[in-house]
């Protein structure tokens, strides 16, 4: 307990008795969006204090005046050192920081999906045992579809994420504990003391005061314009602009333009533009000063009064402050007998201003960039072989993601680069579950992965053994939900050049006009079942050599008009049983030299010398009857199956589509064409 008179500093460390240490001096640095840093010079009658009783233990510094508590600061001991020892006292040095500081000791890479920023921050805090935190948020913060902590400490990630969302944080202190408060508007600040401006003729007994106050204005960017791109709305600009206030003392032409703005929807774009402007102008109107009020701290405002410049007699908020205290009488052996003194130096902005951290400053580090492409594996739900969405995007498992379960929750939907991509034309090859892919990152941003390549590895081997088949260029697929494959292969070995096609089931070819084949050597066709061909016009066949056909069953030929046959030499027909010719009108058989009909030993021979009939008996109009044939019993051919006809893209409707070009709704490639025609975008 402190004395009832004067200024005094006391400290309590862990479970050690309260009188273990006396405070010789301290320095406390506090700022918005930074863990505070308390440095203590202590003295103790014990020369051998157990370090285990101090390090990583709670520590509380109290500032008293006339027995009344003025300020409390509590945190955890991050650094402890023993200094010089005398006859009665040993000096020690302590470093005290908030529990939030522990996040700086752990670097990680992990993925957060479909969570609001405050939910992400809560997870990080709770994982480090921090339960005393609060969110005093005025604005709505959208869920982040995909947010990566990438090779950065938890503290850097917290600072960066808070700054990106326009949040700032500060600490509040209670008995034995401290709370971190995240806010996004100056309305969350608490009202602090009223401090008069002391021209030098008033003492502390008359109340805490400000003994120095400097006012400053600086030229800063006047407005911000951010722009981004979304493949879901490719023709929409996603551009947002915000103009600063209080520009009367500077030009309004200092625009800060940036792309990408790190957003994909308008509400986030508008908010991010305002956050960027506030951060760039966070010291455009500012003040600094010195006071003796230990109650001042970030997250508070104070009212300045009695300043000769009346415009400065207003409410200010603390952005940063450095407290210094000296208690000389704690060092008895060194003749310490001076008074206990305290003072601080502070930086402020107007209380109505919402201060936001500038990205790239100590309060908000830049987002880590991915140095180059990475390897990942395509993943999806159990039992699936191919898993994608309507845009052909896939889910990935990165080797560094220790939290992913190699399923459809491992990442966001990730776009896949194709060899050619137009409006309903181009190439499409969906990486399948288990495939290894090369992932690039737009602008090096870990939040924006895109698959740009595919690679084999030790278990996913190439289709053919290498390097034995190094001359082969192969496109081989794998049957989905079954066994088999389709393949297109090119062999480039000299003397063995080949194009090979394998289809696991069907081959369908649709040619809208002509098809020409020129085979300079042999063609071999082997069909295990039927061949069905339909020609809607004419069929022309020229064989310059020999033609041989063998039909092991029946052969049906139906000609709706005439059949013309012309042979240069002989027509030789042999039937095992019967040859039957039937004509509806007449049959004419004409020979230049001889015509013979022969059955057994009987025959009729007609030649230029006459007609010769020979037989066992010759009957002329004396009974008997003609023989009959089997008659025509041929089969009509079946018709070929239909080939799938893929419809071309629908025609454009300019009146409707031009009207939507500049909307935030998704548009198609046809709209993109119109945008180029209209000069829009």
From Swiss-Prot:
One Pfam family named in its UniProt record: Gp5_trimer_C
Bias (Polar residues) ranges: 289-309
Disruption phenotype: Deletion positively influences motility while it has a negative effect on biofilm formation.
Renumbered residue ranges of the record's region Disordered: 284-309
SUPFAM superfamilies reported for this sequence: gp5 N-terminal domain-like, Phage fibre proteins, Phage tail proteins
Family: Belongs to the VgrG protein family.
Protein name, UniProt field: Type VI secretion system spike protein VgrG2
Native organism taxonomy: Bacteria, Pseudomonadati, Pseudomonadota, Gammaproteobacteria, Aeromonadales
Function text: Part of the type VI secretion system specialized secretion system, which delivers several virulence factors in both prokaryotic and eukaryotic cells during infection. Plays an essential role in bacterial mobility and biofilm formation.
């Amino acid at each position: 307990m402190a004395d009832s008179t004067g200024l005094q500093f006391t400290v309590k460390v862990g479970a050690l008795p309260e009188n273990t240490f006396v405070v010789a001096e301290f320095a406390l640095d506090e700022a918005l969006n930074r863990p505070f840093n308390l440095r203590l010079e202590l003295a103790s009658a014990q020369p051998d204090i157990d370090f285990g009783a101090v390090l990583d233990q709670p520590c509380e510094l109290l500032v008293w005046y006339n027995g009344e508590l003025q300020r409390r600061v509590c945190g955890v001991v991050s650094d402890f050192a023993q200094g010089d020892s005398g006859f009665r006292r040993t000096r020690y040095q302590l470093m005290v920081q908030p529990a939030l500081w522990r996040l700086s000791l752990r670097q990680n890479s992990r993925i957060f999906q479909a969570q609001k920023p405050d939910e992400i921050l809560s997870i990080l805090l709770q994982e480090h045992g921090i339960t005393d935190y609060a969110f005093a948020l005025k604005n709505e913060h959208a869920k982040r579809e995909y947010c990566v902590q990438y090779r950065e400490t938890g503290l850097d990630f917290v600072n960066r994420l808070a700054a990106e969302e326009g949040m700032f944080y500060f600490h509040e202190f209670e008995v034995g504990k401290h709370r971190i408060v995240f806010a996004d508007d100056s309305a969350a600040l608490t009202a602090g003391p009223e401090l008069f401006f002391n021209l030098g003729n008033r003492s502390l007994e008359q109340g805490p005061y400000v003994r120095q106050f400097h006012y400053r204005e600086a030229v800063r960017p006047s407005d911000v314009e951010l722009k981004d791109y979304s493949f879901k709305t490719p023709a929409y600009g996603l551009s947002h602009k915000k103009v600063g206030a209080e520009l009367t003392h500077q030009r309004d032409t200092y625009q800060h333009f940036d792309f990408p703005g790190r957003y994909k929807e308008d509400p986030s774009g508008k908010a991010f533009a305002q956050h960027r402007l506030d951060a760039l102008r966070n010291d455009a109107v500012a003040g600094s000063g010195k006071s003796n009020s230990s109650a001042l701290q970030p997250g508070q405002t104070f009212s300045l009064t009695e300043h000769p410049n009346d415009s400065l007699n207003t409410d200010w908020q603390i952005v940063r402050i450095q407290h210094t205290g000296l208690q000389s009488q704690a060092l008895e052996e060194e003749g310490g007998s001076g008074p206990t003194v305290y003072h601080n130096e502070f930086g402020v902005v107007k209380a109505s201003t919402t201060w936001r951290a500038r990205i790239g400053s100590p309060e908000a580090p830049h987002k880590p960039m991915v140095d180059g492409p990475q390897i990942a594996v395509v993943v999806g739900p159990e039992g699936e072989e191919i898993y994608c969405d309507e845009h052909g995007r896939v889910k990935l498992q990165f080797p560094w993601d220790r939290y992913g379960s190699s399923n459809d929750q491992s990442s966001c939907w990730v776009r896949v680069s194709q060899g050619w991509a137009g409006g309903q034309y181009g190439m499409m090859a969906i990486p399948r579950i288990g495939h290894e892919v090369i992932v690039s990152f737009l602008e090096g941003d870990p939040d924006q992965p895109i698959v740009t390549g595919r690679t084999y590895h030790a278990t996913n081997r190439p289709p053919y053994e290498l390097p034995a088949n190094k001359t082969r260029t192969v496109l081989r697929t794998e049957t989905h939900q079954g066994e088999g494959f389709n393949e297109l292969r090119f062999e480039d070995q000299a003397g063995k050049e080949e194009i090979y096609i394998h289809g696991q089931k069907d081959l369908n070819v649709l040619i809208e006009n002509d098809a020409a084949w020129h085979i300079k050597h042999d063609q071999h066709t082997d069909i295990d079942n039927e061949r069905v061909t339909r020609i809607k016009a004419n069929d022309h066949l020229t064989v310059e050599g020999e033609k041989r056909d063998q039909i092991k069953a029946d052969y049906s030929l139906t000609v709706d008009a005439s059949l013309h046959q012309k042979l240069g030499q002989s027509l030789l027909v042999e039937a095992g049983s019967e040859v039957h010719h039937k004509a509806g009108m007449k049959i004419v058989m004409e020979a230049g030299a001889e015509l013979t009909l022969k059955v057994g030993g009987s025959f009729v021979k007609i030649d230029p010398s006459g007609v010769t009939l020979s037989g066992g008996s010759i009957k002329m109009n004396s009974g008997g009857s003609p023989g009959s044939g089997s008659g025509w019993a041929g089969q009509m051919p079946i018709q070929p199956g239909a080939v799938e006809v893929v419809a071309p893209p629908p025609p454009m409707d300019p009146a409707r589509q031009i009207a939507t070009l500049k909307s935030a709704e998704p548009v198609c490639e046809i709209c993109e064409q119109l945008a180029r025609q209209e000069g829009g975008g």
